[in-house]
Amino acid sequence: MALAVRLLPRLLLSRPLPGWAARLRTLSSAEVKRPLSGLCYLCRRRLGSGAAPFPRVSWASAALALSARGPQRPLLSPLEVASTLPTFPSCPRRTYSTEEQPQQRQKTKMIILGFSNPINWVRTRIYSFLIWAYFDQEFSITEFSEGAKQAFAHVSKLLSQCKFDLLEELVAKETLHVLKEKVTSLPDNHKNALAADIDEIVYTSTGDISIYYDEKGRKFVNILMCFWYLTSANIPSEAISGARVFQVKLGDQNVETKQLLSASYEFQREFTQGVKPDWTIARIEHPKLLE
């Protein structure tokens, strides 16, 4: 019985299997062991196990063993390495330089601090609230000041170019008639000084706000705006009282002279019911330029 139990697995594994199934058999211990297992790579000696001493091999014997195997060809020769590497177009480059890199030109920014009269500031805020409460719910003195700044830059440019026909809907008729007589008689350098670039306007201030009714019951609001701007027009400094001269450095040698001028524009709007909600310029003043 014991012999049958020991032979049964071998009989089952040695029987031919149907179809494509492979035939399994038990491998012997000699077949399982690799021929080079347990051998040293240098001296081909069998490595001991347990308490057997490990054979010591000197560097001389190791060198003799390697030389006995014969010269070995390297995996890649220097020429083959160079040929296998991809070739890229050579670009001229400078790794070190003693020359100083040119520094970028820094822009000079002018900051002008203006301090308004505290009484005038409080008065302006009170009238702004009255306009918002009784006339226009969308009115804001901050937004109005920004719009007045853009209008000043646009109107002053047209005024310096004597394009009075384009100013008919922006300036009051009486004011425009007076401006025609004054501007046409100005020299060219004074005409150029009338134009204010929006980027050259350095300060804006609210001068005065007034609310009044006329005899017919119409409601009006007037807001006086004061502007300070820089101009490059060639005007003698003694020709304009109160003007300030600034020298703006553009580079290492170029120096541009600019003058700080002021102008006052009074904006007017009628809040009578049924009237177009448009702001017009009722007064324009350029000290010493338009007199």
UniProtKB/Swiss-Prot annotation:
- Which locations, inside or outside the cell, does it occupy? Mitochondrion matrix
Q: What domain of life does the UniProt record list for this protein's source?
A: Eukaryota
Q: Where is the transit peptide?
A: 1-96
Q: Which GO terms describe its cellular component?
A: mitochondrial inner membrane; mitochondrial matrix
Please give the chief subcellular localization of this protein: mitochondrion
Bilayer-crossing regions: none
UniProt keyword list:
Mitochondrion, Transit peptide
Q: Name one GO molecular function term.
A: ribosome binding
A biological process (GO) of this protein is:
calcium import into the mitochondrion
Query: How far does the signal peptide extend, from start to end residue?
Result: none
So what does this one do?
A: Promotes sorting of SMDT1/EMRE in mitochondria by ensuring its maturation. Interacts with the transit peptide region of SMDT1/EMRE precursor protein in the mitochondrial matrix, leading to protect it against protein degradation by YME1L1, thereby ensuring SMDT1/EMRE maturation by the mitochondrial processing peptidase (PMPCA and PMPCB).
* Quaternary state and interactors: Interacts with AFG3L2. Interacts with SPG7. Interacts with SMDT1/EMRE (via the N-terminal transit peptide); interaction is direct and takes place before maturation of SMDT1/EMRE.
Question: Which PANTHER family does the entry link to?
Answer: M-AAA PROTEASE-INTERACTING PROTEIN 1, MITOCHONDRIAL
Q: What is the protein's name according to its record?
A: m-AAA protease-interacting protein 1, mitochondrial
Q: Which organism is it from?
A: Bos taurus
